Structure formats: structure tokens, C-alpha cells
Amino acid sequence: MAELRNEVATVKSAPLVPREDFPLLERTVHDRRLVYLDSSASAQRPRSVLDAMDDYYEHSHANVHRGVYAIAEEADALYENARRKVGRFIGAPNPAAEVIFCKNATEGINVVANSWASRHLSAGDVVLVTEMEHHANLVPWLMLAEQIGIELRWLDIDDDFRLDLSDLDRMLDGVKLVACTLMSNVLGTIPPFRRIADAAHAAGAVVIADGAQAVPHIAVDVERLGCDFLAFSAHKMLGPTGIGVLWGREDLLESMPPFLGGGGMIRDVRKDGFTPSELPGKFEAGTPPIAEAVGLGAAVDYLEAIGMDRVIEHDRRLVSYTQEVAAATFGEDLRIFGPYGTEDRGGVISMELKGVHPHDLAQVLDQYGVCVRAGHHCAKPLMRRLGVPAAARASFYVYNDESDIDALVAALKEAATLFG
């Protein structure tokens, strides 16, 4: 084991981008260097994103969509340019109509549940979900089950932490909607989404993809994926909080009623009714998150300058390093939940250290400047499948490197000694 540890330790490289791009990473915690390993919960923001938002507020702040004075037109151009950037980033055929700005991925999924599913599904209809879904892609469907009597059918995971697709065609029999993640926020597993989508469409089902974890880390193209809807959040991809994206096929979005009512989403209002605006406006009621859209556009610019293939390659190198160093250091005392190796896997390491509760572990790591998340990670059905109440999770991004993992492992050793 020691030989493996020494061999692994020599395979190191720098972060994919300069840490100096991220102001928060310059600070210390408990008189130690900050080691941020919680990007699956929320990523840090580069200076370019912060500057873009500041520049908007300092020079172009006004409400969008109706102002005819100069700065209002500037704000409008910035907002719609961000929409175009996002559309290009995910391969949307018609971003001007199909890219809807919302609060976050959770709200995007709820738009589909309330505006599409509630109109197209009825009692007894089946929605297929997976055991590895985040609550954001489970609870809206469970709510519909209570409200209108739909039924949920579950795709389980196998012992290798991948979806069991051995009986996929039978599982899809009679299914009207498939709700599936593009990457598990607990396991890091990347399911064979196109295979699932093709089988779902052959069975006559509509497919929604939860891209909250995947869009920040892998190249996502909605047409190559074969999804009908895609939801994701800005704050996990170097952008600000408070804004997310719902992409949908234009024909499906056209068939859906508005999710929220108010200003901005109407073409006409009468005493006896209203006429909604055209896409995407009918789903963007009220004053939208303008500065946040500008920040998201800047985050897209930053990621595109890196290249998404390089991002996932970097993540996987760190996963491989972590797996090997952890095995060499802790053996069976550290259990990692997720596929071994890097095939079909993203930069998430959820773990259980023998004899240490995940919350205690996270608190000890914090004393060494290491930021990880502990809990059920909004995935309680998956936790029950894994047989644990909670797990500690480290997650990687473009600003991490092997030195961060060395700091994590050193802090884990301290925790093992403390509770041993």
C-alpha cells in the first residue's frame, strides 16, 4: 500500500485555471488555507463573473422589455445576450424561444410538473424516476401523485452504483414521462442518458433531464442527449445564485400554460381573461433576475474558454487520484459510494469513514480548512438504498488540484485518529 501511495503522490498537476481568478479562494479559515471541496452544492465565482455583474449595476441597470431609453435598451441587450450564450452552450436549436430563465433547476422542474405534466397526465399514468435522483426531480412528481393520482415507477441502481437497465423496455411499458438525472449528486454516476431517452421515446414518453450537476462539468447538447426538457442552475457552474434555466422543446413549451401570472408574461389583459405572451416571456413573470443573467453569461464565457472536455477530464483525474490515495491510506476503513474508476463518472466523492458520523467528520475537516458537505444530500431514497443515513461528500471543480486532495486525506487521518 505504501508503494502505491508514493506512486500516486507523484502524479500531480496544477488547477485547470488560476486560483487567483477566484477571490474567495484567497482567504483563510481557522488560520489555514481554504480548501473548497463543495462545488456540487455551489461553485465559487471567478472575478470575471463578479465584474460583469458589478458593471451591469454600475453602468446599465434598468428594467428590461419595454424601456426605450438608452440604459434600458442596454439592459435588454445584456439580458437577451445571456440567453443566447446559454442556448449556444447547451446546443439549443432556438434559444430565443426555448431558453427560459427561472430561479434554479428546482423551479425549472416544477414548471414542467405544473404546466406540462398536470395538463398531460391523469390518474393512473406512470412517471419513471430513478433511485439516484435529487429531491428536486422526485418531490414534484410525488406531489402530482398526491394531487392527481399519477404513479411512480423506480429504476434501481446496481451494486456498482449504476442504473440497472437490464429490464428497461419492460419498465417503460405504459410510462408517460421519464425524469432522470444526467449526473448523480451523490454517486457521481453519469447514466447512459441517450439510451434511456431513445427507449423512452420509442415507448411514447416525454423525457426531462436534471442537468444541475452535469451542465457545469460536461459538454451538454440537448439534441444529442435526446431530452425534451432540461433544467439546471447557474450557481453550480461559476454563476450567481438566484437564476436557473429551463430548456424545453419549442412545441412542448408552446402547448403549456404559464406557470406564474403577472407582469411581463402577458400580451393582453381583459376583465374576462388574458392572453399570454409568446415564448419565452409567458414563463418569465415579473422583473427577471437581470444581473444574475449577466453573471450567468459571463460564467458561460469562462467555461467555454476552458473547454468542457477539459473540465470533465480534470474532474476525473482528481477522482482517480482520490480513489487511489484513499485506498492506500485507509483501506476498507473508508467506504466510497460510487463507481470505481472514472468511466461514466463525474467529480463527486461521497464517503463514510469507519466509526465517524459524517457530520462529525465534516466539522473536523473544517478545522483544517477543508470544506465538504455532510448529510443526505437531498437524496433520501438513495441513502436508504445505500444503507446509510448520511454521507460526507467532497466535490471537485476547475480550481481544485491534487494538493486539495492531499489536504483532505490529511484531515481525514486526523479525524480517524480523533475518533479511533
Regions found by a protein language model. Give the residues of each.
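Pyridoxal 5′-phosphate
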Residues: 1-420
